[in-house]
Amino acid sequence: MKSNQALWSKQLQTSPPDFGKAKFLPRWLFKLIYKKRQVRNKPIILDSKINPTFIKDKISIVILSCKRLKELQRLIDTLKEYFSKIKPKVDLEIILVDNGSGSDLINWAKKEVFFDKIIANKKNLGMAVALKEAYEKTNGEYILLIEDDFIIDYEKPFLENCIEIFNEFYDIGIIRLKNQRNWGKRYRLIGPKRSTSNGTNFWTWIPSFNGKLNVWCAGSVMFRKVSLTSSGEIPIGPNFPRTNKMHQGVLYEEEFGKQYNKNWLAAKIEDCYPFIQPNDNAESPGWGD
């Protein structure tokens, strides 16, 4: 099982995607699901457009790190290269959220001409606690979450296309941007392809039957901040090791996901998977610190 997991985790998505054992919803059922959410979400989204704490079309890039300086440096190098080639047409703020890495990482980050804010937690709070606090300090209408062991490997603009989807489809709360051959899991429920007015094609992921999976998740995602704030509080707890069934990854993704997924759906843009997790390093040392 472990070897299969390792192989799967290092496989990149194909074009067209490998849908494997995923289930496709018939168009009539999919329409019922997304129309209901559009009606429910539209007033929430329109209210957020005039919220003075949300700067319209601004993206807050939140980078979570924990004791992996080399991986973080690699990620930042790839982001710098990407933004040097693809100039964003939207306003950005870049926030580093560090979980107790110590002075070496923080001193390096301060010397980098890259971060607009650095949140340096003196101890490891755990991912759910750290991200919950960091999100409250963002001012963008959208949040792009990247974890320190990812890289960006893409040669086209995509941020503007994400905003286009958000502006035109009120059912979409989050866009998943990870390049991994993970679409074919048994619990994937996928809706028919849709398109924006500028021709950006995307599939919609529907919550799994248990309500926990397929939509809300961590790492390499861009989401509406209002989709987060309107879904209640991210549950927090002790920073248990991953062997504990209630570690913070479960709280963040599955427990909060049950609430988030009631109102919001996820988009996967066709041939737009900018972020890769090389999986060439040890598991984050932050679990159970």
Go through the PLM ranges and name each one.
Residues 173-189:
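Short beta-strand-to-loop element that shapes/binds the nucleotide-sugar donor at the catalytic cleft/hinge
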Residues 110-125:
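Conserved donor nucleotide-binding strand/loop of the catalytic core
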Residues 143:
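Short aromatic/hydrophobic "clamp" motif used to bind/position activated sugar donors
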Residues 96-106:
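A conserved acidic beta->alpha catalytic loop
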